[in-house]
Amino acid sequence: MLNYQVKIGLVPLRRDCTPRPGAFNWEIAEERGRAIVDYIQTHYPSKNLSFADLKGVIPVETFYAESDVEKVAAHMRREKVDAILLINANFGCEEAAALLAQAPRVPVLLWAPLDERFDADGMRYTDSQCGVFGISRQLQRYNIPFTFMNSCRVDSPEFAKALERFARVTCMVKNFRGMRIGQVGMRPKIFCSVIFNEGELMQRFGLHIIPIN
């Protein structure tokens, strides 16, 4: 039975470092992360799409510490999320993000909102785009497949379109894994284009081919 309900885990990120003025300010990153999560949960749920956040899981609701990986991963498993959205509220911690993405083995979407807060002298308070570079490279090192969304505002049409596309792909992956497929007869000899490897389908995707003779 196909299931079209998709739940995405929202994981805002910041850097685990000594706080200091400017781009490594903890409070601004945490405030930004909570605001983005609240906006997504308010404006993007639908009949088939819901979200899970980190409220009550870690104190500041923004993920940064490797020591919290198992706690957050366990929460995502309890919530039965079908995918994870990594949100660079600031420069995220790439090691913690990769370890978390590795745990539930679900589709991952990596995104950084546009940096928008600047002082008159050019001082910026976030460096979200740089975090995407670091995290994407670490995900590659761990051989974790992921999707990237271009930097944009959370209230933009670009974000809405990319989120919907990711949710649709997640739905497909969710229903594809573990599928039982009935094979009625053998392929026609002349159609070499439909040759498949039953063992590889089982190993890679958990698909079961059921011969029906």
Language-model regions, residue ranges each:
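Metallocofactor- and cofactor-centric catalytic cores in central/energy metabolism, strongly enriched
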Residues: M1-K174, G178-N213
